[in-house]
Every structure is written in C-alpha cells, then in structure tokens.
Amino acid sequence: GKRCSGSIPYGYNRLPNDKQTLDELSSFFRLPILFDGENIEIKKETAPKLEQTGIYLGQTNNGLSAFIDASSFKKHAFICGVPGSGKTNTMLHLANSLWHHKKLIKDDTDNLSVTFKEESDPIPFLVLEPAKREYRELSRYDIPELIILSPSASTKFPMRLNPFEFPKGLTLSEHISKLCQVFEGAFPIAPPAPFILDKAIEGIYRAHGWNTNDINTGEKEYPTMSELYDRFQKELSQTTYDSEIQGNIQSVLEMRIGSLLRREMKDIFDVKHSTFSPEEWLKHPVIVELESLGEGPANFVTLLLCTLIRETLKASPRADEEKVVRHIIFIEEAHNLIAPEAQVASGQDSNPKIAATAYIVKMLAEVRALREGIIIADQLPTAMAPEVIKNTNIKLIHRLTSIDDRQLIGSTMSASGIQLEHVAVYRPGEALMSYEGLQRPFELRIQEQKGHGSETPNDDELYDIMLHKPAFFQLAQKEENLRVWDYPNKHFATQKWRLYIRTPCLPQQCVLFVRSLKFLDWRKTPCQPWNGSVKIKS
C-alpha cells in the first residue's frame, strides 16, 4: 500500500479526532493559576458548614452565613488579635449568643411527619475580666438574668467569696487539694510553705467538725480566711525549722494570706457565706470585674472560681442532661494569668504563673467531659503556653501584625501562607477561623454587636440599669453577703430608696428591700412617686 516517507503506514500517522495521545492532550490541559487574593466561585475546602442553627458568627467573604454548633465549645476556644482588631466585639457577641441559644427539638404535635421546632436553651457563662470594664456593656442587652460583680472599695456591686465553701456532694479532701493549687497558682509560695498551708487548711476544717473524707451535705459550717491566718501561724510555731526558714515562711503568711485580709479584701474573702453558692454560679450569666484587686488577688479569684465550677460539675455530672454545654468560662487578657510555658517550677524558683498555667492546661483536658467550655482571649498567641493553644478546638484570629504570632497560631490550624499574610492587614471585625471538621480555616466578618463602640456605663449608670434586672433584686435579698444594701447612715439609705422607687419592680421585691433597710412602713405603693413620707427606725 501507499506509505509516507517514514516507516508508519499511510493513514496511521493521524488518529481520529476523538483519540489523542497523552502528549498531544497535555498541551490543552493546565491547572488554574490564581494571583494572590483571587478566588474561584466554587465550593472550597475552607468553606464553613452551612447549617442554619447554632451560634451565628457572621458573614463569610462569599456572603454566606456562618454558624457553629454550640457543642463545639465543649472543646474550648482561643481568640486573639491586637488592640482595636475587634476581639472584644467577638467576645461580647459570643456571650450574648450563648445566652440566647436555641436548640432544635422534635415537634410531637405533628403526627403525620417528623418536624422540629426551636426551643430556648440558654447557656450560662462567667466572664473573668482582669483589666478594663468593657463587658458591662452586656447590661444594655436583653439579658434580665445578668449579674455584674465588681469588688472594690465602696463598690455598688460587691462580691463575697469564701474559699472554704465548696459544692455539695464533693469530698473535703479533694477540695483541700485543689485549694492548695489555687494558692500556689496565685502567689509565689516556695517549699516548705505549701506543706504548712495544707496542714493549716485541714486544721481549720477539723475545728468546725469536718473530717477529710467527709462528703459535703451543706450542714456543717465553713471556716474563714482569718481563721486560716491564725492557724497557719500556729502550725509554723510548732515546726523545728531554723529561724531563717521560719522568717521566710512568716513573710509568706504576711504577704500572701495577710494581703487577702486587708481593707476591701477582707470584705471579699473573710466571710462566712459567699455571694453565690458553688451551684448558683452555673445558673446565671455573670461578669466579674477584677481590675481593682491587683494581679495576685485577681488571679486567686480567677483560679478559685474555675475550681468551684469544675468541682460543681464533677459533683453533679448528670445534671442538666438535656444541655450539650452546661456552662462557659471566658478568661479575658489571659496573659495576666497564663505564662508562655506550662512546666511547673519547683523549689525556690517557684513561679505562680507557671503553676497557674499548668492548672489551666489540666483543666482544659478535664472539663470537656463535664460539658464545660473555656474561651481564652489574649492579644498575642506568643504570650500563651503552646499547650493552651493546642488544647482548644475553635481558633479565631483577628489582626496580628507580628510574623511570629501568625506563624505560631497558623501552625495549629493548617493556615496557608497567603491566609496568614492577609491576617496582618485585617480590618476591625475580620477574622480567620478554624474548628474541628475543616481542612483549612476560612475568613469571615464577625457580627457587630449593636451599640458596641459607644462609651461603657459608669458605676452610677450601671447601677440604674441593673436595678431593672430581676436577678439583681434576687441578689439583693442576700443582705448579709452584699455591702450594697448595708448603708452606713439613714440619709444615704433614704437616697437609695428614692432611686429604687423610681424603677419598675415587683411589690414583693420592694417589701424585701424595705425590710432589709429596717423601715417601719411606707405610705405609698412601691411604683408610685414618693413624697418623702417614710418613717425610718430611730
């Protein structure tokens, strides 16, 4: 037959159009190449889940609504960003959304098909704010059950906290062990002082009829901080340490425990009964402002409240079984408590921050099974121990300018180099988010809270706002635990009564208020204008 000039038979040197060799096809196939910042309008691996229930976060770059299931917070969250990047707005949004959380339940009224309806499922929270007073902005939101505690001199929102009060159903031995860790995490206490502290704590309980293996039933009396001070001194005097060691331990007593008994600290810690019982901390949304206390006492309160909540959850693990999350703790400005390393120091080099960090890391691992979530917020990831960041499921990054910070947090959430470059130029509210189930993080803009950015209320304004919240009235009934109702003179009491009577309230609550002020009677109904005709007991 006919042949071409080569060795291939004529007609075979060209295949039909529908058959091509790989070499021929390769010239027509190219993978898409994107310039930085470009994207293809197809579903990406970084796209968030498209559920329409749970906690609403905000809008993605593609205009999609981003939600996250509330159960994800059981595995904790870490939020970071430089000042002004929108971190506080994010925390306020999460707190408000958690309290207004709704869950889907089966609608039994429809017998023909399986349908679901929304049901209110508020998740209580505790905000521990060591600096500033920005979270009091939540008082302007629709949270009637909100409680704000701001322990300081002449405060209108006092807090009483007896460290020796612990949950019902828990053994005394376990509480003593945890309480010693709280002291070591808040104050520098070098050996052998921790041993004497442990012995002194056990001694004051025994003086009230406790045994270490007792389970708390709520019937026995709790000791106080001043009793611990005296007992510590007694235990120290019975040791055989030389005078120098005894002098060092005496300094620990004066500087650490003694500091909790001076001025307003005495009103906070040296009390028989706390503002809340351990169980009540799990029922309310609470903000505790710690700015006025100083670093040591503030860290002591933070660790103590975390301990009480953990103990309460452990003592009643089956309570609120219908809730996927029982409670959330917000730890703001975490660098005040948490160190860049979590290795516990020993000996004379004892560092309370390292001890506190180890305590928080351990708590992150333990409370997940108890349906407790912890949200840790700080400006810089490098200020946190790596174990803290690694043990959190949800990671949310606002603007970070330092490459070290971006690389550290980015390595824990599989962020690409391009994504981390974008983080450095984020505008306020923009964030990079990752959680379990995503291959890569995605960008979004967090929902801006209404009113955020306006000036937070001062003490007088906040007091007026809180008077309208039922939870504040309930707290007022605990007269012996709240200085806000312990007026120093009749004139001041009368002024407070005038302020109180201007607010809408329930008559029964007003009666309790009047009795607490020891008024003999009052001539007008509580919510009518007051004409001054109130007789005060002489």
Can you annotate each of these PLM segments?
Residues 300, 427-538:
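Conserved P-loop NTPase motor module
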Residues 1-48, 418-474:
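Phosphate-binding and hydrolysis-coupling loops of NTP-dependent motor/remodeling domains
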Residues 83, 93-96, 167, 348, ...:
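Conserved ATP-driven motor cores of ASCE-family P-loop NTPases powering translocation/secretion/packaging/pilus
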Residues 1-82, 89-90, 94-96, 101-119, ...:
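Basic- and hydrophobic-enriched, low-structure N-terminal and domain-boundary segments
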Residues 75-76, 86-87, 133-136, 231, ...:
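Flexible loop/turn segments at secondary-structure boundaries
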